[in-house]
A protein has these predicted regions:
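Long, low-complexity N-terminal extensions
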Residues: 1-159
């Protein structure tokens, strides 16, 4: 709620003064676009929330994944496909692996969506931006993940 009270007026000002239309706001019954997504820790407990133009808050802790923006539907679908890996039971490093894997897959399948992205590693001590070198190291681990999946699939008997 504190995030909502601080962020909503700033974003409303931004839209009122710089952007002619808030997506979804003018249409009756339309779902408004999310203004902002926030992730962090409160009293040692992780949270993921988004806030829409009407101030409504969506919570995603149980899912452990959320996306907003032009490619969000595809990113959320990719996140769903990774759900069987039980990412909410894994550490932050595994979350970074999954995020980079999803972002790279979207870049291949939908090159017109989005642009450069920043990846942050978030834990109770704070948020740290990953450098290009860090992301390259993560991509090496993602390649190994894909190799292990392929090997496991090869060992399964065919129908």
């Amino acid at each position: 709620r504190a995030v909502q009270e601080r962020v909503l007026p700033l974003l409303r000002y931004h839209y009122d003064n710089f952007i002619a239309q808030v997506p979804g706001e003018q249409q009756s019954g339309a779902t408004p676009a999310t203004y902002v997504m926030v992730a962090g820790y409160a009293n040692g407990t992780p949270f993921i929330v988004d806030i829409d133009p009407h101030g409504l808050i969506g919570r995603y802790e149980e899912v452990g994944f959320h996306a907003i923006g032009s490619g969000s539907a595809m990113a959320q679908q990719a996140g769903t496909l990774l759900a069987h890996f039980q990412m909410t039971d894994r550490d932050v490093d595994h979350g970074v692996l999954a995020a980079v894997r999803v972002l790279d897959a979207l870049r291949v399948t939908s090159p017109s969506i989005g642009g450069p992205v920043d990846v942050y590693r978030l834990n109770p001590e704070g948020a740290v931006a990953l450098s290009e070198e860090d992301i390259d190291r993560v991509r090496e681990r993602v390649r190994r993940w894909a190799e292990l999946e392929s090997e496991a699939l090869d060992r399964l008997p065919s129908a």
